[in-house]
């Protein structure tokens, strides 16, 4: 299994449609995306024996929030994008349970992308982060563990409104 990677490649072509120009990606060794609660890869404990591998996520250990909702995404058509939104309060751990995809994160100032391709690693994404999921390999299954029940009022669906609030909060 390959490991998850972080890349600082230019992302201007990945800006949400109709959105303002994308912020510059952070330079190597630069500040992580997420001004107060940085996005980060979380290593998940794995236990392997002749019966297979068990991967664990515990509240208070691997993640510092209670899981109030979980969902998975699968069967994403080739070339399609998921996400294209931000959250006001919600925190989440995103895991590629099978296959791979990239998550582009944007806090209104910095932008980066994470490749998720190992079920033993997840991406923590905190509040006030715009996210896009792209590059789904055939057969990919992604799992989201989230801190809040679904509430449409908690979402940013408009990138310019997200940018306004994200930049005003800093």
Regions found by a protein language model. Give the residues of each.
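Non-catalytic, conserved peripheral segments adjacent to functional cores
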Residues: 1-5, 18-121, 138-141, 145, ...
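Well-ordered alpha/beta subsegment
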Residues: 118-123, 128-135
């Amino acid at each position: 299994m390959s490991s998850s990677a972080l890349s600082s490649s230019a992302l201007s072509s990945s800006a949400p449609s109709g959105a303002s120009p994308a912020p510059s990606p952070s330079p190597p060794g630069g500040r992580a995306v997420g001004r107060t609660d940085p996005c980060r890869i979380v290593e998940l404990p794995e236990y392997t024996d002749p019966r297979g591998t068990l991967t664990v996520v515990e509240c208070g250990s691997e993640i510092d929030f209670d899981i109030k909702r979980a969902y998975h995404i699968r069967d994403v058509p080739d070339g399609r994008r998921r996400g294209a939104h931000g959250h006001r309060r919600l925190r989440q751990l995103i895991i590629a349970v099978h296959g791979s995809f990239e998550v582009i994160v944007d806090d209104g100032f910095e932008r980066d992308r994470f490749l998720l391709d190992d079920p033993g690693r997840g991406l923590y994404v905190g509040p006030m982060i715009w996210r896009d999921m792209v590059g789904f390999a055939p057969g990919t299954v992604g799992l989201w563990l989230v801190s809040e029940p679904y509430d449409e009022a908690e979402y940013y669906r408009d990138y310019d409104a997200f940018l306004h609030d994200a930049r005003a909060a800093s």
